[in-house]
């Protein structure tokens, strides 16, 4: 079962997992400076930094913005060891249901 968990920098292990996956999955010019990302995660109430879980094991990350009238997915990555298992499709379906 897919589950999203919003995180902050206080969730040290999960936040470290997210930063590692972010830096592995995207070129540095495609994500904010990590210090800025930490600030956004902790202070921007309409920014959602989430770990994706499947059966209570982390399998990826998804960040998005809630602008009231629409949502904007900023980053979405599945852990390389978990890719090609259908998680991407499952996450997008789950998110569509969640944000209806």
Q: What is each model feature region?
A:
Residues 1-36:
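Short amphipathic alpha-helix that is part of the acyltransferase structural core
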Residues 10, 79, 83:
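Glycine-/small-residue-rich active-site loops that bind phosphorylated ligands and cofactors
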Residues 26-54:
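Active-site rim helix/loop that mediates acceptor-substrate recognition in acyltransferases
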Residues 51, 57-65, 70-77:
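Conserved beta-strand in the GNAT
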Residues 97-100:
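Conserved GNAT acetyl-CoA-binding A-motif
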């Amino acid at each position: 079962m897919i589950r999203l968990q919003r995180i902050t920098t206080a969730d040290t292990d999960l936040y470290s997992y997210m930063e590692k996956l972010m830096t592995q999955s995207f070129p540095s010019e495609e994500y904010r400076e990590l210090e800025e990302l930490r600030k956004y995660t902790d202070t921007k109430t309409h920014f959602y930094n989430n770990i994706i879980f499947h059966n209570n094991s982390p399998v990826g990350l998804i960040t998005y913005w809630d602008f009231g009238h629409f949502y904007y997915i900023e980053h979405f990555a599945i852990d390389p060891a978990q890719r090609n298992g259908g998680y991407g499709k499952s996450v997008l379906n789950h998110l569509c249901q969640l944000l209806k």
